[in-house]
Curated annotation (Swiss-Prot):
This is Pantothenate synthetase. HAMAP family: PanC. The keyword Ligase applies. It comes from Pseudomonas aeruginosa (strain LESB58). It catalyses: (R)-pantoate + beta-alanine + ATP = (R)-pantothenate + AMP + diphosphate + H(+). It is found in: Cytoplasm. Homodimer. Catalyzes the condensation of pantoate with beta-alanine in an ATP-dependent reaction via a pantoyl-adenylate intermediate. The active site is at residue 37. The keyword Ligase applies. Keywords: ATP-binding, Cytoplasm, Ligase, Nucleotide-binding, Pantothenate biosynthesis.
Amino acid sequence: MNTVKTVRELRAAVARARSEGKRIGFVPTMGNLHAGHAALVKKAGERADFVVVSIFVNPLQFGPSEDLDKYPRTLAADQERLLEAGCHLLFTPTVEEMYPDGMDGQTRIHVPGVSEGLCGASRPGHFEGVATVVSKLLNMVQPDLALFGEKDFQQLAVIRKLVRDLNLPVQIFGEPTVRAADGLALSSRNGYLNEQQRAAAPAIYRTLRQLGERIRAGAEDFPALLADARQALEQAGLRPDYLEIREPISLRPGVPGDRQLVILVAAYLGSTRLIDNLSVHLD
């Protein structure tokens, strides 16, 4: 595995791989990697011949009161994990390399519709930052395919629409959420939880599953279902930010009669905000 820091080095390495007839797979990350990231890299290796991973903590997607400064930087451990997972090229740019004219002067990309509401309402500007950095990275790497985790469901919807609307020549894959044995979705932010909070956290997925089972059993009073689920989260010690039932492509509010739904949740344990989701298929 080679590690490069500049766009010039990145493009040269990818060009060499492509000249050898290799199919390029790409996994963008912010580092502090866990088994979920490793699964994405391994899956990229199954679908492509040459796997590129980026590690960049993108300031453009953090709000002024969010955890940019305390977000863990664990490059040495990340490199070891990536080597084991089968990464061929690691791109670790600086902020200056990504935004040479500064962030205030950076062209930004807004993806309408799917970026609004849910995390878009709670984190103004977040998806603009995500769409901008992903667009830049896809242009820098120019992969045949890119992989993202389904845990960040709204982010995946934003990226799919971005790629579709801008006719970017890349195939986007969403990969299933990797979970701990107790159901908690793996996340770099789980490390912020103390012992008591970590013990309470599995209530998120447990509540999603219970809500999904009720919908599959035929319950159609979505407001009442959501009220019960919010109460269950609160009783477990969580503070819900949002809990909603949506249609999975457009992310419009789900209605009885929809055959494909996704339940999305964001909830706080202390100051740590965790997200998760559950797809519900009624066919």
